[in-house]
C-alpha cells in the first residue's frame, strides 16, 4: 500500500540501520546489503477511532517503526534512535515506543537527533493506575492535530507563555508525583494541563474547538466525583478531540465507570 511521506521517512531511516536477519538456527536468511532488494507490504489495522483525539497516529506510527525495526533487525547507533525515527512519523509516537511514564525530550541539536523519548518509569511502576477511555465520538475531527498546532504556533500568545514558563516546571512536578505514586498531585496536574491545552486552542485564531458538550459533561462529572470524595480520584484529560481519558486508581474504577454508564448508556442498554 502507499504510505505518506512521513511513513516513507520512517521506512528509509530504519533501512539504514538494517542488519543481517538470522533464523532460530543461526543461519543468515537475509544479508543486510540485500535488504535494498526487498519491498515492504504494509497493513495497518486500528481498533480505536482514527483521527478523533485518541492518539491513533501515535499508536500507528510507533507500531510501524517497532515492527520495521524487528523485521530489518535494526540496531540503534545511539540510545533512543528508534524513538527519534518514530518522531518523524508522528511526534507523540516517540513516547509510545515505551510503556509506563515516558518523557519526550525537546533536544538542542539542529538536526533533531537528540529529540528522543526517555522512559521515566516502566509499565510495572504503578500497577494500580487505570485509564477509563470514553469514546464520545468516533468521527474524524475537522482540524487535524498537525494543522491545529501550526495555527496555534503562529497565532496564540498563550502557547508561547506555556512553552516558556509552564511546561518544564509542570513536567518535573508530574514526574515526581508519578514516581511517588501521588495521585492527588498527578491528577490535578493532568487536568490543569488538559485545560490549558484547550485554552490555547480557543486562543488560536481562528479558534479551534475540539471538545463538545458531552466532553464538558464528562469534566463536570469528574468534578462532582472528586468533590464527593473530597480528593482527586478521577482525572480527566482530552487530547485534540472530544474523547476523554479518565485516569484513576483501580479501587475507584467501578464507581467512575458506573457514573459514566449512568449518564451515557450504551446503545440498547
Q: Which stretches of residues belong to each language-model region?
A:
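ATP-binding N-lobe of GHMP and related small-molecule kinases
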Residues: 1-52, 66-79
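Short, hydrophobic/aliphatic alpha-helical segments
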Residues: 36-47, 86, 217-229
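Short coil/turn connectors at secondary-structure junctions
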Residues: 36-40, 77-80, 98-99, 128-130, ...
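Active-site nucleophile and cofactor-binding loops and adjacent substrate-binding regions
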Residues: 54-56
